[in-house]
């Protein structure tokens, strides 16, 4: 087994290194371990290595990082990995580094002493992934989280092999999440007052190992797009109105458009401004004393001229009064005549 690690220039410290190798080797086989990592001087661009979380103060010059391994006296060491040596006829070699959504997954079915194989079959969770064939390599171009599981392979050795089908031990393949499904939040509230401003924030984060990648964001309302994809994870509504009420969601996608995820819907309800009621109306100031009536000028007449219509009505009323008086006079005369006949003496004479 060979170990190669080449440094191109002298440096005071080394950036986080990655030791690449297959996780399982066949006994008596040859394998090269490659140490990959940028090398820079103290003024270089790899300052992140020195800024990792520090360990206990008692460790002196040693600091630890869950991602980069550890540092000692200014040097950064790769994170260790487990290497297995197998004496089986077949082994399935998986990737040495973490596999994320969107990556290409490559599996190798290797035989003892690299003897040629035929009728090779790859399996996932015990189910064949295809018919037998001569290829000892299986790949998934754009892996998803659902592609994780236990894989193994089987094949038949050509001469001088045993001639029977052999199977490799299962290997667990875990696909890491590149970024979580975004969550849409409304700031300061999902129930803003009419006329206020609202900021929609599409919140998610890339995995630390892929933090150099970028995500593009877009926003939607009631099935229609509100913005084109861009690097900004926020959408601002400067002046909210009742028309802005509805169901919103956002989408985060990688720059190569291979991985996209949507957020759950968020209901935005814009509260209309309430007009003040009579009880809420502020009291009016007390009115001062009324001004005195204006003094009449000498030119203004004291009485206005009578109304012609009123004069006509008065004439009719006087005429009716006179008619009533005449009628009353006739009634008085009639009553006098009747009183003569009603006297007692007059009645007796009339009876004789």
Curated annotation (Swiss-Prot):
Residues 1-30 form the signal peptide. Residues 46-65, 275-310 are annotated as: Disordered. Residues 50-61 have a biased composition (Acidic residues). Keywords: Cytoplasm, Differentiation, Disulfide bond, Immunoglobulin domain, Repeat, Signal. GO terms for biological process: cell differentiation. InterPro entries: Ig-like_dom (IPR007110), Ig-like_dom_sf (IPR036179), Ig-like_fold (IPR013783), Ig_Fc_receptor (IPR050488), Ig_sub (IPR003599), Ig_sub2 (IPR003598). It is found in: Cytoplasm. Highly expressed in spleen. Expressed in immature B-cell and B-cell lines. May be implicated in B-cell differentiation and lymphomagenesis. Monomer or homodimer; disulfide-linked. This is Fc receptor-like A. It comes from Mus musculus.
